[in-house]
Amino acid sequence: MPDLDYSTLPQSLRPLLDKFYRAHGSSMRASGEGQLWVARDGGIIAGLSLTAVMEGFWLTGLFVEPRWRGRGVAGELIANALATVAGPTWLFCHPDLRGFYEKLGFSHTTRLPQALADRLARYSRSKSLIALGISSAAKNE
């Protein structure tokens, strides 16, 4: 696999990440707040957003270009992003993705900041989602 560039994307370039999502038929949108992270092989091949919430961060918008899936890009992008932040990180995902995230150190949680608990309750009305989290200590293992 070629050397990929994992780095932050300035908010001023957020439209590039939104364009990447749209080009692959994803309804995801890059967060207007927080850090945007991308993996590049020339152009963007994966992206995610990390938004500060309470004493930690909320990971959203993880998407990898289909031809790059199964090659470790998502895990490496997450690892690079989480290495730069202190405190716990949470995400919501479909239950089928639980194993993928558990391999990265995340675990199922029901303890969420109230703002995220409210979002999860609202989102869960229309789709099947679970909450996962990772502590600062687990990020460093």
What do these predicted ranges mean?
Residues 38, 43-52, 56-63:
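Conserved beta-strand in the GNAT
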Residues 83-96:
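Conserved GNAT acetyl-CoA-binding A-motif
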